[in-house]
């Protein structure tokens, strides 16, 4: 793979790439000089595309003449066309060619100056001067295109046109009509200029990385790209090219080749800004302006950032969190075991300094606010600043009372008064914890996928200079969380940049920490370390059996649970540069205010030296010297041992001395090696032995050093090169990714700097493991070769190189994130094993060489895995064994490396290799063949505790000896993601970019420009690049990774493929899926090196038509996982998964680490402590299963796949007739909404994905195509329906499969619409379902029961099946209308006499509708109706214990909507059927529960227009059981689907639904109360009722076939009524509400909600009712954040509509908002005012609006404007003074929350509300009236003369309406009901206070109103009086929800349609009486609307029933 990081130097001779026709050989442009840049030597490609151009004389084009351009002004698909008849055959169609605009002045300049050029441009006359201006560079452009001949018709039309160029190309590249251009073929003489990086921006869409890859391949690859180019992919994905780079230089255009790296930046992302409120935030800026630090943030940086955003018009979502760590001074020493320190109140205890306990605080100031509202953001920030410090400093005074161990309040207060709280300094703050919590926000971004935003960016603003002291564990956790996702972290530092490398994490080396459990839980195990937070019991470098002897601080304390004296602190510090954090410094001076410092000292361009004037003295050198922070005290003097001629041999020892401990506790360890410098390395300065001879007869040390001094006085003329250039690249491969198993701290001792340990000496690579370069004299290397070879033969062919000092500070090696464990005082080799068996065998052979293992042998045997020691070997024990104790034989220590105690060998080994290991410590400069070990042990004679403080200054920790362990040491585990450095003296040429930037490397076109960072990353975050160059070394790869292979082949029967996928297509899908999961393709030569090959056959992922052959591979990596996809066996793909081994210490760390911060969310009134599991393991994915899914072996989306998912609901809106052009006259709101769902269902059915194997079959039976959705509509909630109607529900498993028994007649006997007998048709229709008839049954709608009716959609399906000449449902509907009784028939007699021509077969139950294919109820006309079987109406008289089944009930009917089981009452406390009902369905065979599935799933094609290159199929889940008053649920699941196509489909659904009064809203999949588990910075807001509801509740009635009252209401009746009052709609029911005897599930899983969840009609607010009756409120950010919503909000603001106010819901008066219909946002309101409609009336607080919708009243005719007639107190208001409330287009969730909360806190309002609900109880049914009816008195008022409303009661009649006795009711008797607008809205778009406002001409409508919704006592008394005055006539009410338990007394209004309606009502009443009913029948209703009509009349026991 070619390099992705071009070198500035000339690579010399390179092999040309194997490209046909040389079409893609590129040369660098010569627009300006290319600066040198640091690069990874590994990444220089062997087929680099950068090369010198030949001289112009050698490449003169054959096209010497110039051609004339003609610009195509019209739309053109082809950007350039050539007339090949004129140009000739030298231009071959399909080849690449360059077109250059000819400029004579450029030619003259070029000819005069072309000899200055190192590289030449396209043609000899186009040579630009090297110093030309930018304008000239802009004008000098070339366009490369694929040659295509002009069509014949164009040639005929324009015969003289030579070059035909599209207008947009001509404009960009400076071509005009008649311009002269030259054409040049792209070949090896004239290669294309390949862009190194192309930057694209996009917004308002979610673009997965798979989409980015395909966009680059299909729209950019092998094309010219130019700045400003608009890219459109699949007709919907849009992006714009914002910059083109050639090797770091911006150019106007270049060629997108195979080595070009696309950078995708999102302008609609999510930003989380963390502001660290450390102590310094309140300090003054002493170095700069002198202002307070926080002011620099809110007055400097943030305004500048927000203004940048505004100028770029980006659409980000911003969350801002303030965080701080508060330290507590308890007033007494923690060492004394103060129980308060063990207090669970604290988050932890500081690991250094004063060891104070601390508490972490987080304050959410802004939560997901649009970036355009930045003024509000800054205001909230400034306001919070005033209180933040006070709140966190006093929090403990309240919070610690509950944690106090004392029961005496006085003692508690005294203890609290002693504690002082203070914010910690930034360096000790909770920096990593904040980042870790931020990453948890997006750990599950595949759930509730936001389809409008791409990218996540976390910005941390800190007063720190860029260095943080962190715990290793926190660093490990954060790194693990970040390396696998696409989150970028930017650090903005407020102070000036320091002089050391940044960003820097300072952490204690975990190898020295011996505390076995987590810091604030370590109450039992003794600690051997002063690091309270380290959980790995690893062994310290100077630990004895008794404890630790490493340096400690005087202020160190012992954590609670530790015993004092258990050990002294091991202050061993490492300094790490993370690859996932990028730092900037706010200077506040200019647009260049963010000076990017990052790793400036490490990789800055050394050639650009700064002038002396730039240097500012900013530190006190003396202090640095005293603290040993500098590299050396003698700044200019190099350490002696770095000189190649220094006599290192003199500094060697021969034996292994025996250590001993004196009575003072000092450990005396005899030198293994004589000190190699002139002063003692032992910090006690107690003993100095310079005269020890390494061997007998050798010169004394003094003599050798004297000779050296003399030789140095005679300076040689030639010095050996310490860094031979030929080996630099070899170093990089070995060190760059292995960065040292060994490493040192901020190591400053010059004794560490030996030539062989410097980076320049490292020549070992994965495939040159036997070579070492030695800077010493040649003979020294040769002299040692034999010994090494002997050792190597026993041990391993590979040797791990010694890593240079600066790399030791940050270990990237095999032991990961912490420094490799210190080892015994023995000469130990660090060997990387290539073969596990050989390494283990050889190590054990060495170990068993002697009877007692030497320390060296023990050290060799030591590994990162569980440790095994030979018996008798003294070991360091992390559990504090006594001195001299021996470990048991073969003792295992799980988790951490151990270090054998350096003891004197009991026998001298005779084996040379063993002697080499145990006998002496050789300088690595003398013997480069192996690596030195712990230097301090080698040099020390004794270590005194008081001197130990200095030990960390010159630690040098050697690498571990891997034995291919099953686990990795902590240092190795995270090595690729950190770079250890000495921050004060990093080697500027040693840090490799590929390692330093790792997966983000290819985002930086200019990696050398590190001093200044533009605003780009803060304004438009980049997605994780598609490619990376990082790959482990061969040794790492073989020793640290497990391999899991499997093969995948395409399933030939894959139903989701049009035809079987080719292997290339399957490979592309597998790559796409991995891109979506965060993988990157590994490019560059590192892969080949890791496999020990010079070259690998690697697939080119950016090739458009590349065909993968057998043997080709592609490597993809993410985190610690590498996938190799290889083509094998012709059709198969072999997958090798390489997974890094787990961390060795995992068992010893507290894996369930609970982090306990105090968080205050946006709406909280105070801080609340909560525990978070920071180590929640992410389960490994089963990639075999995933790839099997891609290959088509299974198509079910299971949780193993981690598929993307989103949930949507359709919320019923209050509709206006002006917005329903598609509906027919007379539809109610409810009917319109059901029609909208039917339209959506038709759309889904039309575009459902049909497998290719079924298409021919589907085409042949198109007319047989039944509606697969088969949605069952009920007017009760699902739990109620399941409890009451279980046995007849078609959703019951077992009923669905055979619910249609096929056609009644064979094809020969089918009817024909041209000629059929009406009587025969009627007979066939009324056959039992099993005989082919249509399902006839009693059907309830709201309060009305319709007998023996069928549904329009069922009839449509039946007609299609039984008529041979019907082709589709439209024709069937047309035929059904011919069979209808016409509307002009006035009576059934007329129908009987007048309809003999094929009509008059059936009629709408209310005669309101013609025949429709939908949820409409029809009955067979009396002429053709079969007589009802005996006992048809007897079902309510059947004993309740035996559910009865009417004759019409057939189990395989598609619509069994009436249950014959006993009536039930729903109560959420218990099962709805508990104690009273045992459904017959529960008696299934085998005792299994009956199973009901409430939703279905279908495969839906989101690309029905076939724009994509692949099938785009999602799983669409939809409700099967729906109550039109509730939300309709839709859920989408997908894998490997273009998200933008899904978004387009959803927007189309939203537009369609909005036309029918439905709002499509995205809602969270999980319920609101669980939000904190996903997002720790959000918490539901709890609203408590000021007055608890009374225990007395109304009675709930429910029975599907009768009105027998039941005695138990639903739970939380008042709370549900309250939410509905505030316009909330039921979303999801809790799992507990379903009967326990029924197995209820959805197509996506089991119901799992704990509480009942509602959603506001605006879609912006979610509410839940808890078990205690409290209300939880949560903003629905998924919906309110949509960009469409923001656009509409802007439109509304421009329109000037008022926001809120006016009524108690914040809905102010004013004009209705104008909104675009169907927009997919919270403002997508279906209501639009016109000239005739008044503003939409919204229910006020007096009424329960949603549950009391007048679903029977549709937008029939416009009436005069009116108001609701009631105020917020429930009292009637004067119409002249009432302002009509308007439902605004936008309702902020905060406004709704405030209104709801204010009402809930108002005791008087709540009591009045409860009273209104209970007043129904005060009016029991009057004995002298129809049972179940309360006396109702309704005042009469004058109505309009033309009112034609038909009522079922005399005093509610009007016009020509008659009662059952035939009396005419005069218009003047029509009373004024004063009904709420929730009932009377949408009749002409008006609210009505007077029935005269209803203009219902010639149609029967039903109006049912529950008194629960009527808030006026006066209305109730009036209704009672009216009822008492006419006891003989029944009134009928719409039923309320059963769960609400609405009482039985109802006001019923039946509006009939003329005299016939009254007659029908009378007939129904008579029929009911004849059937034995105690009272008359139901008020007539439409199937959808519940309106009254032809079947109305008296209501006996029915009248009191409640219905929803």
Curated annotation (Swiss-Prot):
<dbReference type="InterPro" id="IPR045838">
    <property type="entry name" value="DEPDC5_CTD"/>
</dbReference>
<comment type="similarity">
    <text>Belongs to the IML1 family.</text>
</comment>
<dbReference type="InterPro" id="IPR027244">
    <property type="entry name" value="IML1"/>
</dbReference>
<feature type="compositionally biased region" description="Polar residues">
    <location>
        <begin position="18"/>
        <end position="29"/>
    </location>
</feature>
<feature type="domain" description="DEP">
    <location>
        <begin position="1330"/>
        <end position="1422"/>
    </location>
</feature>
<dbReference type="GO" id="GO:0005096">
    <property type="term" value="F:GTPase activator activity"/>
</dbReference>
<protein>
    <recommendedName>
        <fullName>Vacuolar membrane-associated protein iml1</fullName>
    </recommendedName>
</protein>
<dbReference type="GO" id="GO:1904262">
    <property type="term" value="P:negative regulation of TORC1 signaling"/>
</dbReference>
<feature type="compositionally biased region" description="Gly residues">
    <location>
        <begin position="1694"/>
        <end position="1711"/>
    </location>
</feature>
<feature type="compositionally biased region" description="Basic and acidic residues">
    <location>
        <begin position="128"/>
        <end position="137"/>
    </location>
</feature>
<feature type="compositionally biased region" description="Polar residues">
    <location>
        <begin position="746"/>
        <end position="773"/>
    </location>
</feature>
<feature type="compositionally biased region" description="Polar residues">
    <location>
        <begin position="1760"/>
        <end position="1775"/>
    </location>
</feature>
<dbReference type="GO" id="GO:0005774">
    <property type="term" value="C:vacuolar membrane"/>
</dbReference>
<keyword id="KW-0472">Membrane</keyword>
<feature type="region of interest" description="Disordered">
    <location>
        <begin position="1042"/>
        <end position="1061"/>
    </location>
</feature>
<feature type="region of interest" description="Disordered">
    <location>
        <begin position="1"/>
        <end position="64"/>
    </location>
</feature>
<dbReference type="GO" id="GO:1990130">
    <property type="term" value="C:GATOR1 complex"/>
</dbReference>
<dbReference type="GO" id="GO:0035556">
    <property type="term" value="P:intracellular signal transduction"/>
</dbReference>
<keyword id="KW-0926">Vacuole</keyword>
<feature type="region of interest" description="Disordered">
    <location>
        <begin position="1754"/>
        <end position="1775"/>
    </location>
</feature>
<feature type="region of interest" description="Disordered">
    <location>
        <begin position="1684"/>
        <end position="1732"/>
    </location>
</feature>
<feature type="compositionally biased region" description="Basic and acidic residues">
    <location>
        <begin position="774"/>
        <end position="783"/>
    </location>
</feature>
<dbReference type="InterPro" id="IPR048255">
    <property type="entry name" value="IML1_N"/>
</dbReference>
<feature type="region of interest" description="Disordered">
    <location>
        <begin position="107"/>
        <end position="139"/>
    </location>
</feature>
<dbReference type="Pfam" id="PF00610">
    <property type="entry name" value="DEP"/>
</dbReference>
<dbReference type="InterPro" id="IPR036390">
    <property type="entry name" value="WH_DNA-bd_sf"/>
</dbReference>
<feature type="compositionally biased region" description="Gly residues">
    <location>
        <begin position="1986"/>
        <end position="2004"/>
    </location>
</feature>
<feature type="compositionally biased region" description="Polar residues">
    <location>
        <begin position="1455"/>
        <end position="1464"/>
    </location>
</feature>
<dbReference type="GO" id="GO:0010508">
    <property type="term" value="P:positive regulation of autophagy"/>
</dbReference>
<dbReference type="InterPro" id="IPR000591">
    <property type="entry name" value="DEP_dom"/>
</dbReference>
<dbReference type="InterPro" id="IPR036388">
    <property type="entry name" value="WH-like_DNA-bd_sf"/>
</dbReference>
<feature type="region of interest" description="Disordered">
    <location>
        <begin position="1441"/>
        <end position="1482"/>
    </location>
</feature>
<feature type="region of interest" description="Disordered">
    <location>
        <begin position="1374"/>
        <end position="1401"/>
    </location>
</feature>
<feature type="compositionally biased region" description="Basic residues">
    <location>
        <begin position="113"/>
        <end position="127"/>
    </location>
</feature>
<feature type="region of interest" description="Disordered">
    <location>
        <begin position="742"/>
        <end position="783"/>
    </location>
</feature>
<feature type="region of interest" description="Disordered">
    <location>
        <begin position="513"/>
        <end position="534"/>
    </location>
</feature>
<feature type="region of interest" description="Disordered">
    <location>
        <begin position="1977"/>
        <end position="2004"/>
    </location>
</feature>
<dbReference type="Pfam" id="PF12257">
    <property type="entry name" value="IML1"/>
</dbReference>
<feature type="compositionally biased region" description="Basic and acidic residues">
    <location>
        <begin position="1383"/>
        <end position="1398"/>
    </location>
</feature>
<dbReference type="Pfam" id="PF19418">
    <property type="entry name" value="DEPDC5_CTD"/>
</dbReference>
């Amino acid at each position: 793979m070619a390099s992705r990081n071009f070198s500035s130097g000339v690579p010399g001779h390179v092999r040309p790439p194997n490209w046909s026709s040389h079409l893609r050989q590129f040369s660098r442009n010569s627009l300006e000089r290319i600066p040198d840049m640091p690069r990874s030597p590994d990444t220089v490609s062997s087929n680099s595309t950068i090369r010198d151009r030949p001289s112009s004389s050698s490449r003169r084009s054959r096209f010497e003449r110039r051609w004339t351009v003609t610009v195509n002004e019209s739309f053109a698909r082809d950007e350039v066309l050539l007339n090949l008849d004129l140009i000739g055959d030298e231009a071959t169609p399909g080849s690449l060619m360059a077109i250059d605009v000819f400029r004579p002045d450029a030619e003259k300049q070029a000819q005069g100056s072309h000899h200055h050029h190192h590289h030449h441009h396209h043609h000899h006359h186009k040579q630009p001067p090297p110093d030309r201006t930018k304008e000239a560079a802009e004008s000098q452009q070339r366009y490369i295109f694929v040659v295509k001949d002009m069509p014949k018709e164009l040639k005929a039309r324009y015969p003289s046109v030579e070059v035909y160029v599209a207008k947009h190309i001509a404009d960009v590249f400076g071509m005009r009509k008649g311009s002269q251009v030259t054409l040049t073929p792209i070949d090896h003489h004239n290669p294309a200029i390949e862009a190194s990086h192309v930057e694209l921006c996009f917004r308002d869409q979610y673009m997965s990385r798979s989409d980015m890859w395909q966009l680059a391949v299909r729209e950019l690859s092998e094309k010219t790209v130019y700045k400003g180019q608009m890219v459109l992919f699949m007709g919907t994905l849009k992006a714009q090219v914002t910059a083109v780079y050639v090797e770091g230089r911006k150019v106007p255009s270049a060629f997108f080749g195979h080595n070009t790296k696309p950078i995708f930046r999102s302008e609609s992302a999510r930003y989380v800004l963390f502001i660290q409120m450390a102590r310094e935030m309140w300090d003054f800026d002493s170095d700069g302006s002198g202002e307070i630090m926080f002011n620099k943030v809110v007055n400097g940086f943030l305004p500048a950032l927000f203004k940048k955003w505004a100028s770029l018009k980006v659409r980000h979502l911003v969350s801002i969190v303030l965080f701080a760590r508060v330290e507590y001074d308890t007033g007494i020493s923690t060492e004394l075991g103060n129980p308060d320190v063990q207090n669970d109140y604290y988050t932890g205890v500081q690991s250094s300094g004063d060891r104070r306990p601390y508490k972490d605080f987080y304050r959410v100031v802004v939560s997901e606010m649009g970036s355009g509202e930045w003024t509000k953001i800054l205001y909230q920030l400034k306001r919070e600043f005033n209180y933040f410090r006070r709140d966190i400093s006093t929090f403990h005074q309240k919070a610690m009372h509950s944690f106090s161990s004392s029961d005496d309040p006085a003692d508690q207060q005294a203890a609290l008064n002693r504690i002082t709280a203070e914010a910690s300094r930034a360096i000790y703050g909770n920096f990593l914890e904040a980042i870790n919590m931020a990453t948890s926000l997006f750990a599950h971004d595949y759930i509730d996928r936001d389809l409008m935003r791409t990218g996540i960016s976390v910005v941390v603003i800190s007063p720190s200079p860029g260095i943080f002291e962190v715990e290793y564990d926190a660093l490990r956790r954060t790194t693990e969380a970040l390396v696998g996702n696409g989150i970028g972290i930017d650090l903005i530092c407020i102070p000036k940049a320091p002089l050391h490398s940044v960003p820097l994490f300072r952490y204690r080396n975990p190898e020295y920490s011996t505390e076995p459990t987590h810091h604030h839980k370590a109450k039992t195990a003794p600690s051997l370390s002063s690091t309270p937070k380290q959980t790995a019991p690893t062994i310290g470098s100077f630990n004895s059996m008794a404890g630790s002897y490493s340096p400690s601080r005087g202020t160190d304390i012992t954590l609670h649970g530790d015993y004092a004296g258990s050990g002294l602190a091991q202050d061993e510090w490492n300094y790490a540069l993370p690859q996932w954090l990028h730092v900037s410094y706010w200077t506040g001076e200019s647009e260049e205010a963010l000076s990017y410092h990052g790793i400036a000292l490490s990789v800055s361009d050394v050639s650009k030296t700064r002038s002396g004037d730039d240097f500012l003295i900013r530190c006190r050198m003396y202090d640095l010297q005293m603290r040993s922070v500098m590299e050396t005290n003698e700044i200019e003097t190099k350490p002696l041992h770095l000189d190649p001629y220094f006599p290192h041999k003199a500094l060697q020892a021969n034996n292994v001395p025996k250590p001993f401990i004196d009575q003072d506790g000092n450990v005396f360890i005899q030198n293994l090696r004589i000190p190699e410098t002139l002063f003692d390395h032992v910090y006690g300065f107690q003993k100095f032995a310079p005269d020890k001879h390494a061997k007998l007869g050798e010169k004394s040390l003094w003599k050798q050093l004297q000779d050296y001094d003399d030789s140095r006085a005679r300076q040689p003329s030639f010095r050996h090169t310490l860094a031979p250039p030929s080996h630099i690249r070899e170093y990089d491969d070995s060190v760059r990714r292995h960065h040292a198993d060994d490493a040192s701290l901020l190591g400053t001792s010059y004794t560490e700097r030996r030539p062989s340990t410097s980076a320049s000496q490292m020549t070992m690579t994965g495939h040159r493991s036997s070579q070492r370069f030695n800077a010493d004299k040649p003979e020294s290397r040769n002299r040692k070769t034999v010994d090494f070879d002997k050792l190597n033969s026993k041990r391993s062919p590979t040797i791990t190189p010694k890593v240079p000092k600066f790399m030791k500070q940050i270990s990237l090696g095999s032991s990961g994130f912490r420094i490799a464990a210190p080892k015994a005082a023995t000469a130990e080799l660090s060997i990387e094993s290539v073969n596990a068996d050989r390494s283990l065998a050889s190590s054990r052979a060495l170990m068993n060489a002697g009877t007692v293992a030497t320390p060296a042998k023990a050290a060799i045997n030591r590994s990162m895995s569980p440790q095994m020691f030979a018996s008798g070997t003294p070991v360091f024990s992390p559990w504090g064994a006594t001195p001299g104790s021996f470990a048991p034989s073969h003792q295992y220590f799980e988790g951490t490396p151990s270090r054998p105690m350096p003891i004197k060998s009991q026998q001298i080994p005779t084996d040379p290799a063993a002697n080499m290991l145990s006998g002496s410590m050789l300088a690595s400069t003398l013997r480069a063949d192996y690596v030195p070990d712990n230097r301090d042990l080698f040099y020390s004679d004794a270590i005194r505790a008081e001197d130990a403080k200095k030990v960390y200054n010159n630690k040098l920790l050697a690498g571990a000896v891997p034995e291919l362990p099953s686990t990795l040491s902590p240092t190795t585990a995270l090595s690729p993601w950190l770079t250890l450095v000495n921050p004060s003296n990093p080697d500027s040429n040693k840090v490799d970019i590929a390692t330093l930037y790792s997966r983000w490397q290819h985002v930086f076109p200019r990696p050398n420009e590190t001093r200044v960072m533009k605003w780009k990353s803060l304004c438009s975050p980049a997605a994780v690049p598609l490619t990376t160059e990082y790959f482990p070394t061969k040794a790492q790869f073989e020793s640290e990774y497990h391999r899991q292979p499997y093969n995948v082949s395409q399933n030939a029967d894959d139903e989701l493929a049009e035809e079987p996928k080719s292997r290339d297509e399957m490979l592309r899908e597998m790559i796409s899926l991995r891109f979506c999961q965060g993988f990157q393709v590994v490019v560059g030569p590192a892969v080949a090196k890791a496999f020990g090959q010079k070259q690998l056959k690697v697939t080119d992922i950016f090739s458009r038509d590349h065909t993968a052959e057998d043997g080709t591979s592609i490597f993809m990596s993410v985190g610690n996982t590498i996938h190799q996809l290889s083509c094998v066996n012709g059709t198969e793909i072999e997958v090798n998964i390489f997974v890094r081994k787990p961390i060795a210490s995992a068992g010893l760390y507290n894996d369930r680490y609970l982090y306990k911060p105090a968080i205050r969310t946006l709406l909280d009134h105070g801080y609340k402590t909560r525990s978070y599991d920071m180590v929640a393991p992410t389960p490994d994915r089963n990639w075999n299963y995933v790839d099997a899914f891609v290959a088509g072996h299974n198509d079910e989306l299971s949780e193993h796949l981690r598929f993307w998912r989103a949930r949507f609901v359709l919320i019923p809106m209050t509709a206006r007739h002006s917005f329903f052009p598609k509906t027919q006259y007379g539809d109610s709101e409810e009917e319109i909404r059901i029609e909208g769902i039917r339209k959506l269902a038709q759309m889904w059915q039309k575009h459902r994905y049909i497998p290719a194997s079924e298409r021919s079959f589907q085409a042949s039976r198109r007319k047989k195509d039944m509606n697969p959705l088969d949605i069952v509509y009920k007017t009760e909630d699902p739990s109620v329906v399941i409890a009451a109607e279980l046995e007849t529900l078609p959703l019951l498993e077992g009923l669905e499969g055979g619910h249609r028994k096929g056609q009644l007649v064979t094809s020969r006997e089918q009817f024909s619409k041209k000629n059929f007998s009406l009587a025969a048709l009627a007979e066939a229709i009324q056959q039992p379902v099993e005989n082919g008839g249509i399902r006839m049954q009693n059907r309830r709608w709201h309060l009305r029961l319709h007998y023996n009716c069928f549904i329009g959609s069922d009839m449509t399906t039946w007609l299609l099946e039984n008529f041979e000449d019907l082709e589709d449902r439209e024709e069937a509907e047309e035929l059904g209308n011919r069979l209808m009784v016409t509307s002009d028939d006035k009576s059934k007699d007329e129908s009987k006499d007048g309809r003999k021509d094929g009509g008059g077969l059936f009629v709408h139950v209310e005669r309101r509708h013609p025949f429709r294919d939908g949820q409409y109820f029809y009955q067979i006309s009396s002429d053709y109706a079969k007589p009802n079987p005996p006992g048809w109406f007897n079902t309510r008289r059947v004993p309740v214990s035996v559910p009865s089944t009417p004759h019409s009930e057939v189990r395989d009917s598609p619509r069994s909507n009436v249950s014959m089981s006993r009536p039930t009452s729903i109560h959420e406390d218990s099962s709805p059927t508990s104690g009273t009902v045992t459904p017959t369905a529960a008696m299934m065979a085998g005792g299994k529960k009956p199973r009901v599935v409430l939703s279905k799933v279908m495969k839906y094609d989101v690309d029905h227009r076939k724009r994509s290159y692949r099938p785009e199929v999602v799983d669409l889940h939809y409700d099967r059981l729906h109550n039109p008053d509730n939300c309709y649920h839709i859920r989408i699941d997908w894998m490997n689907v273009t998200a933008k196509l899904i978004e387009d489909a959803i927007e189309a659904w939203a537009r369609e639904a909005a036309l029918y009064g439905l709002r499509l809203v995205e809602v969270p999949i999980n319920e609101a109360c669980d939000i904190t588990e996903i997002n720790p910075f959000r918490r539901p807001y709890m609203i408590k009722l000021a007055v608890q509801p009374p225990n007395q509740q109304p009675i709930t009635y429910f029975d599907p076939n009768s009105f027998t009252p039941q005695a138990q209401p639903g739970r939380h009746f008042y709370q549900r009524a309250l939410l509905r009052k505030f316009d909330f709609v039921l979303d999801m029911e809790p799992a507990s509400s379903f009967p326990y005897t029924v197995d209820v599930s959805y197509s996506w899983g089991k119901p799992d909600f704990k509480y009942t969840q509602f959603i506001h009609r605006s879609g912006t607010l979610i509410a839940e009712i808890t078990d205690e009756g409290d209300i939880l409120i949560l903003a629905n950010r998924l919906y309110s954040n949509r960009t469409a919503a923001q656009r509409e909000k802007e439109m509304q603001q421009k329109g000037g509509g008022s926001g809120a106010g006016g009524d108690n819901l914040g809905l102010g008066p004013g004009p209705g908002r104008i909104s675009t219909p169907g927009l997919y946002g919270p403002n997508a309101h279906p209501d639009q005012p016109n000239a005739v409609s008044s503003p939409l009336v919204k229910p006020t607080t007096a009424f329960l609006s949603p549950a009391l919708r007048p679903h029977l009243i549709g937008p029939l005719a416009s009436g005069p404007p009116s108001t609701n007639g009631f105020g917020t107190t429930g009292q009637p208001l004067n119409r002249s003074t009432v302002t009509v409330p308007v439902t605004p287009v936008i309702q902020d969730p905060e406004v709704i929350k405030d209104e709801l909360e204010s009402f809930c806190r108002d005791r008087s309002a709540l009591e009045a509300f409860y009273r209104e609900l209970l007043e129904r109880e005060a009016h029991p049914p009057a004995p002298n009236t129809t049972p179940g009816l309360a006396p109702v008195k309704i005042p009469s008022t004058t109505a309009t003369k033309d009112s034609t409303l038909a009522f079922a009661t005399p005093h509610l009649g009007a016009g020509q309406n008659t009662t059952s006795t035939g009396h005419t009711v005069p218009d003047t008797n029509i009373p004024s009901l004063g009904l709420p607008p929730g009932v009377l809205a949408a009749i002409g778009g008006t609210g009505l206070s007077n029935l005269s406002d209803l203009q219902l001409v010639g149609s029967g409508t039903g109006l049912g109103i529950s008194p629960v919704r009527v808030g006026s006592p006066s209305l109730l008394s009036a209704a009672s009086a009216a009822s008492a005055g006419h006891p003989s006539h029944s009134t009928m009410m719409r039923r309320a929800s059963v769960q609400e338990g609405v009482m039985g007394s109802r006001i019923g209004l039946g509006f009939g349609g003329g005299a016939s309606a009254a007659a029908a009502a009378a007939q129904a009443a008579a029929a009911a009486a004849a059937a034995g009913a105690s009272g008359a029948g139901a008020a007539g209703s439409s199937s959808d609307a519940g309106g009254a009509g032809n079947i109305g009349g008296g209501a006996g026991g029915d009248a009191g029933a409640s219905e929803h």
